[in-house]
Design a protein with these regions (language model features):
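Hydrophobic alpha-helical transmembrane segments in multi-pass integral membrane proteins
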Residues: 152-173
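Core segments of transmembrane alpha-helices
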Residues: 25-34, 90-107, 149-158
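Loop-to-helix transition at the N-terminal end of transmembrane alpha-helices
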Residues: 45-61
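A cytosolic-side transmembrane-helix exit/cap motif
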Residues: 67-78, 132-145, 166-169
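Juxtamembrane helix-capping/reentrant segments at transmembrane boundaries
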Residues: 75-94
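Short, Lys/Arg-rich, polar N-terminal cytosolic tail immediately upstream
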Residues: 1-16
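Membrane-proximal helix-loop-helix units in multi-pass membrane proteins
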Residues: 99-152
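Short, hydrophobic transmembrane alpha-helix segments
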Residues: 34-49
């Protein structure tokens, strides 16, 4: 009984947190700053940092499609998996934290070139995950929110990143 009350209190405090309530907008702001920095410093940045900056911006666009226009990807996954989630605030915040760890850290630690593998793996998994969820979507059998940006943006950037890492500069990273 005491644990349940403690857990509810912690969840209430977490949901009141600015970053939790506004995780999508914080992601968009950070991605915009990263993209602006990338554009301004393009000529002086290592290619892996450029790629990570582009990934960050594209993931932010991808999250807009997943959560807002048309939105509903997290809700669809929760429904399809039968997870007992009543409030979508926490899953959305988890998505924000994954984005920060997978994108912002590799971008800021640009001298550790192998960290670009995180965004590369995320960019590779995104289209696959959206095709799987789209196939399981009873309404359309093909579409899931996020699939358009995953296919149009992630696949080409993944192909270029693989090409760059294994052909152009295989030893330097």
């Amino acid at each position: 009984m005491e644990y349940a009350r403690f857990t509810k209190l912690n969840l209430d405090l977490i949901k009141k947190n600015f970053f939790v309530r506004n995780s999508l907008y914080v992601t968009l702001t950070l991605a915009g700053i990263v993209m602006l920095y990338t554009i301004i410093n393009w000529n002086t940045m290592p290619m892996t940092q450029r790629i990570t900056g582009i990934y960050y911006f594209l993931i932010a666009l991808h999250e807009i499609e997943e959560m807002k226009f048309p939105g509903g990807f997290v809700e669809m996954v929760v429904k399809l998996t039968g997870m007992p989630v009543k409030d979508m605030t926490i899953p959305h915040f988890c998505l924000f934290m994954i984005t920060v760890y997978m994108m912002l850290i590799p971008f800021c630690l640009s001298s550790i070139h192998w960290l670009v593998i995180g965004p590369l793996v995320l960019g590779t998994i995104e289209p696959i995950a959206h095709f799987v969820v789209g196939k399981a979507n009873p309404a359309t059998k093909i579409y899931s929110p996020g699939i358009i940006t995953a296919v149009i943006f992630m696949i080409p950037l993944d192909i270029y990143t693989f090409y760059y890492l294994f052909s152009v500069a295989p030893v330097s990273w």
